[in-house]
C-alpha cells in the first residue's frame, strides 16, 4: 500500500514536469482551428485555435452567419427559407385591384443581398415594377415572381454594378431603357422560346439578353438551357408577331425557321445575330420590320414567303454574304413587294465579288434560278428596288402593259446585257433611262429596246457609255437636246416612231455610231445634232429622196451627211437605194 502511494506521487510529479516543460518550451508551430458551433444562415458560429502538439487553446473567433443563398424561386438552398424583402414600397394601381413596386425603404446606396418581388401584397396581386423603382440600389440578385407582367422605363436607372436577374414567364412588357445602365451577370427566364416571343420590348435597352454575360431559358424539358448554346430556333405558329428587339443578344443562333401562322417580324427582331446562316420564313408572313436582320453578317440563305408585302428600311443592312434567295410566290407578286429602301433588298449589301442567285418555284414546285426575266402581262406596276442587285440577271423583257416602274428597280444588275421595256424612265414624270438603274447604268448592258416611248427627253440616255444598240418605237415626236450625247460605244440606233425633230446635239459625240435608221416624219435636224459622229457609215431613211432633201438643216453638223459614207432612201418599191451624197 505504501509502495502504491509512492508510485502515484512520482507519476503526478512527472506529468506536471512534462506539461510545465511544454508550456515553457512549445513554440506552437503547428496549430489548427476547431469549430465549436457551426454558423447557420442567420446565426453566428464560433471556433478556437489549438496547438496540435501541446493542445493549448490559443484563441477564439466568431464565424459570421452565412446568409441565405437563394435559388431562382427565392428559396434558400441551405435552410429552405423563402426570401421576403420587407423594404419594398408598393403603390396601389389605378384599378384598385393590384399593386406595383415603386421603390425600396432603405437609404440610397444601401446594400441588400437579394431582392424578391412577391406576386402578392395585402392579398392583392403585384403586377408591375414602376419607373425608377430600384434606382441607385445595391443588391446582387433580383427575383421577380410569377404574375408580374410589366417593368416600367428606367426601373434600374443608375444601377451600375453587376447583378443576377430572374424573369418570370408572366412578364409581357418591358419599357424603355430598363437595362440601359445595368450590368447583368446571369439572366434566368422561367419560360420557353414561345413564351419569350410574347414579351414586348420597347427599345434595345429593354432586352436583358444583350446585356448579360450569361443567359438561360427553359427548354422543352423545363430545364435551363444556356442561350449561348442554342444554335437553331423554330418560331411556333402560335406566335402572330415576332416583336421588336425580340432576339437581340441571341448571338449563337445559326438557323431560324418560322412556322405557318407567324405574320410579322418586328423591328430589329434578329439584329446583330451574326451567326445566323439561314432564315426560313413561313408563307403566312406579310411584313419584315426595320433592321429586322441587320448585321447578320453570316447570313447566306433566305426563304421568302409568297405573302410578303412589305420589307421595311434596312431590313437586311450589313448582311454582306447573302447569295441565295428562295421566293415561294409568283413573279407578279414579287413585283408588288414594297421595298422601302435599298437595304430592304436582301442582296443589297452582298460583297460585290459574290454572285447572287434568286430562285422561284416552277410548275413542278421546284426551285429554279431566275437569270432571264420576263414580266407577266398582268403586271401594271413594278415597285422600287424589286430586282436591285440581282447581279446574275442577264436579260429583261417588260411588256407594254406595265404602266409604272419604280426607282432603282434594276440597280446593281451587273450581268445584264439586254433589256426590252415600254418607256424611258418611270412611265410618269421621270424620263431618264438611268432612273431604273439608280443612275448607274451597268457597263454590261449592250442592247436596249424601247417599245412604246412617249418621249425621248433631254439627256435621256446620259451615262449609257457602254450601250451599243438602241431601238426606239412608240409615239414620241421629238428627240430632245443631247438625248444620246456622249454614248461613246453606241454603234447602232433604230428610230421607228414618228419623230418630227432631232434636236440640238441629240447624237453629238457618239463616236462609235456606224448605223442609224431615221423615220420619214423627220422635218428638222437641230444644231450639231450629229456633231463628231466620226464613225458614221450608213444612214437609213425610211422615206423618199424628196422627203430627205426637204429636212431642215440648222448647220453643217446638224445632218448625218457630214460624216456618213452611205445614205439610203426608199424607192417606189419600198426598198432601200443609196443616194449620191455629193449631189
Annotated model-derived regions:
Residues 1-10:
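Bacterial N-terminal signal peptides that target proteins for export
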Residues 4, 33-36, 316:
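Generic, low-specificity signal for short hydrophobic/alpha-helical stretches with a mild N-terminal bias
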Residues 11-16:
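Hydrophobic alpha-helical targeting segments used for export or membrane insertion
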Residues 22-25, 70, 74-583:
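Solvent-exposed loop and capping/linker segments of extracellular ligand-binding repeat ectodomains
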Residues 22-83:
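Thrombospondin type-1
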Amino acid at each position: 500500500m505504501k509502495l502504491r502511494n509512492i508510485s502515484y506521487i512520482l507519476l503526478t510529479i512527472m506529468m506536471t514536469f512534462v506539461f510545465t516543460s511544454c508550456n515553457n518550451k512549445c513554440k506552437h508551430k503547428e496549430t489548427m482551428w476547431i469549430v465549436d458551433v457551426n454558423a447557420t444562415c442567420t446565426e453566428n458560429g464560433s471556433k478556437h485555435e489549438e496547438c496540435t502538439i501541446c493542445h493549448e487553446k490559443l484563441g477564439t473567433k466568431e464565424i459570421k452567419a452565412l446568409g441565405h443563398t437563394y435559388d431562382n424561386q427565392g428559396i434558400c438552398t441551405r435552410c429552405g427559407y423563402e426570401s421576403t424583402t420587407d423594404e419594398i414600397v408598393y403603390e396601389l394601381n389605378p384599378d384598385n385591384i393590384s399593386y406595383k413596386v415603386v421603390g425600396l425603404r432603405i437609404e440610397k446606396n444601401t446594400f441588400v443581398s437579394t431582392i424578391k418581388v412577391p406576386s402578392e401584397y395585402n392579398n392583392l396581386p403585384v403586377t408591375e415594377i414602376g419607373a425608377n423603382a430600384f434606382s441607385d440600389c445595391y443588391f446582387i440578385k433580383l427575383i421577380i415572381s410569377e404574375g408580374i407582367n410589366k417593368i416600367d422605363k428606367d426601373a434600374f436607372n443608375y444601377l451600375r454594378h453587376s447583378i443576377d436577374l430572374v424573369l418570370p414567364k408572366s412578364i409581357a412588357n418591358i419599357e424603355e431603357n430598363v437595362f440601359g445602365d445595368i450590368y447583368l451577370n446571369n439572366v434566368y427566364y422561367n419560360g420557353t422560346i414561345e413564351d419569350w416571343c410574347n414579351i414586348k420590348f420597347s427599345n434595345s435597352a429593354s432586352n436583358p439578353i444583350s446585356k448579360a454575360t450569361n443567359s438561360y431559358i427553359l427548354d422543352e424539358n423545363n430545364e435551363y438551357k444556356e442561350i449561348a448554346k442554342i444554335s437553331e430556333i423554330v418560331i411556333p405558329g402560335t406566335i402572330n408577331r415576332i416583336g421588336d428587339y425580340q432576339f437581340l443578344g441571341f448571338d449563337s443562333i445559326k438557323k431560324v425557321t418560322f412556322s405557318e401562322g407567324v405574320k410579322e417580324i418586328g423591328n430589329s427582331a434578329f439584329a446583330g445575330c451574326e451567326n445566323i446562316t439561314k432564315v426560313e420564313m413561313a408563307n403566312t408572313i406579310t411584313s419584315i420590320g426595320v433592321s429586322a436582320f441587320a448585321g447578320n453578317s453570316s447570313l447566306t440563305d433566305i426563304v421568302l414567303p409568297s405573302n410578303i408585302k412589305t420589307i421595311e428600311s434596312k431590313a437586311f443592312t450589313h448582311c454582306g454574304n447573302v447569295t441565295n434567295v428562295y421566293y415561294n410566290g409568283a413573279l407578279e407578286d414579287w413585283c408588288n413587294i414594297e421595298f422601302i429602301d435599298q437595304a430592304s433588298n436582301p442582296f443589297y449589301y452582298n460583297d460585290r465579288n459574290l454572285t447572287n442567285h434568286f430562285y422561284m418555284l416552277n410548275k413542278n414546285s421546284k426551285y429554279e434560278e431566275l437569270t432571264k426575266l420576263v414580266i407577266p402581262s398582268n403586271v401594271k406596276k413594278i415597285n422600287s428596288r424589286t430586282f436591285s442587285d440581282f447581279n446574275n440577271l442577264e436579260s429583261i423583257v417588260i411588256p407594254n402593259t406595265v404602266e409604272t416602274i419604280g426607282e432603282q428597280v434594276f440597280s446593281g444588275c451587273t450581268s445584264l446585257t439586254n433589256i426590252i421595256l415600254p418607256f424611258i424612265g418611270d412611265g410618269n414624270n421621270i424620263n431618264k433611262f438611268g432612273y431604273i438603274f439608280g443612275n448607274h447604268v451597268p457597263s454590261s448592258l449592250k442592247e436596249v429596246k424601247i417599245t412604246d416611248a412617249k418621249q425621248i427627253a433631254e439627256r435621256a440616255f446620259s451615262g449609257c457609255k457602254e450601250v451599243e444598240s438602241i431601238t426606239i418605237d412608240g409615239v414620241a415626236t421629238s428627240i430632245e437636246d443631247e438625248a444620246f450625247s456622249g454614248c461613246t460605244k453606241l454603234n447602232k440606233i433604230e428610230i421607228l416612231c414618228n419623230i418630227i425633230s432631232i434636236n440640238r446635239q441629240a447624237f453629238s459625240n457618239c463616236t462609235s455610231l456606224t448605223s442609224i435608221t431615221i423615220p420619214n416624219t423627220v422635218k428638222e435636224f437641230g444644231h450639231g445634232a450629229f456633231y463628231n459622229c466620226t464613225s458614221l457609215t450608213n444612214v437609213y431613211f425610211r422615206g423618199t429622196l424628196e422627203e430627205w432633201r426637204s429636212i431642215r438643216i440648222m448647220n453643217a453638223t446638224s445632218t448625218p451627211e457630214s460624216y456618213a459614207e452611205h445614205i439610203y432612201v426608199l424607192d417606189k418599191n419600198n426598198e432601200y437605194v443609196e443616194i449620191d451624197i455629193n449631189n
